[in-house]
Every structure is written in C-alpha cells, then in structure tokens.
C-alpha cells in the first residue's frame, strides 16, 4: 500500500518526504484555508518536494464550472490530480476530464455504490472516508473491504485511497482491507513512528555502548 500525506502544510510535507516514504499528497479546501496562503503557490512548492500524484480539489458545484476550474490545476503539472465531490455533477466532470486524460480523485465516498459509479465515470482514484463513517458508528474499514472486492471481481483499475484516517491502527486495517493507498495526516505519520519498545531499546543500546566504552 502506498502512503500519501493529507495536508497543505509545505513544512509537514517536506519533513515526511525526507523519510523516503511518500508517494503523493492530497489537499482539500479546508486544509488550504487553514494555511492562509495562495493555493497555486502552495501547489508549486509541493510539486518541487513530491514526485507523485498531488490532488487539488475544486470548489465549484456545477460540472461546467468544475471542468473550467480544474484547468488551472492540471495545466500546472502532469502530476496534478483533480479532486471532485461525489455528486451527479462531479461524475459528469469526472467523465469529461478523464476523457481528456486528466486523472480525477473522487472524494466524499461513503458507500460501495458511490465508489462503483465513480470508477465507471473514469476516476483514477476513489477516496472512501474511513474516520467519518466510524464517527457515526459505521464500519469505515468494511467500506474499503467491500469496494476492493467489487473492483477486484470486475477488473476495475481505479485505485482506492483510504481517507479520513485518524489513527495508525486505521492505516494497518486499510492495508489489510485492500486499499491501494492511505492518505494520512502529519500527526498520524508521527504516531506511526512510535513504539515504547523501540524507545526503550534505543535507550538500552546507548547505555550498553557507554558502559562498554567505560571498560576500554
């Protein structure tokens, strides 16, 4: 399973990219607004850091407007992926953009039916929201599992991005359920680094090393 980072913070992207684990980036209007910066400039900086799919989300609600808004993004670089909402208008825009060879990431997926519609509209990626389903006592990982089963059964090439990830455990479960990608907030990336036995093991190695030096 590939790992994307879900943020518009360039410093966070640069930090996690330095670990050698990133394959792409996802953003959304809320993340962009949080940074308070010009989005086109942010995209240019991200493109210099990560050589992989970079999802840029439109804010328009009508298909014609979505397609027009998307142009400024996909003309910027071949790695830009257009992120569209799972609506009838979003599907129309996806079909039109995909026909031009523009990759689309359909977001706000909460059912296998929605994922299937997006795949048939030509989406390169679908983004089921794990955490938000868990918030309403629904099994978000089961959505990943069901979608992966349908795609495998029918030879659908659309990649599944496990989104709305809240914990390291959800990353593992998404991988086991068949997600091709997990898009992960910076905070969860840092949590994935940690284990108490790793910390205590490093501390013990250092103590043993110092003790050995003292005996020389």
From Swiss-Prot:
Residues at the active site: 83
Location(s) in or outside the cell: Cytoplasm
InterPro entries listed in its UniProt record: Aldolase_TIM, TAL/FSA, Transaldolase_3B, Transaldolase_3B/F6P_aldolase, Transaldolase_AS, TSA/FSA_arc/bac
Protein name: Probable transaldolase
Its EC number(s): 2.2.1.2
Major site of localization recorded for this protein: cytoplasm
Family: Belongs to the transaldolase family. Type 3B subfamily.
Chain's gene name: tal
UniProt enzyme class: transferase
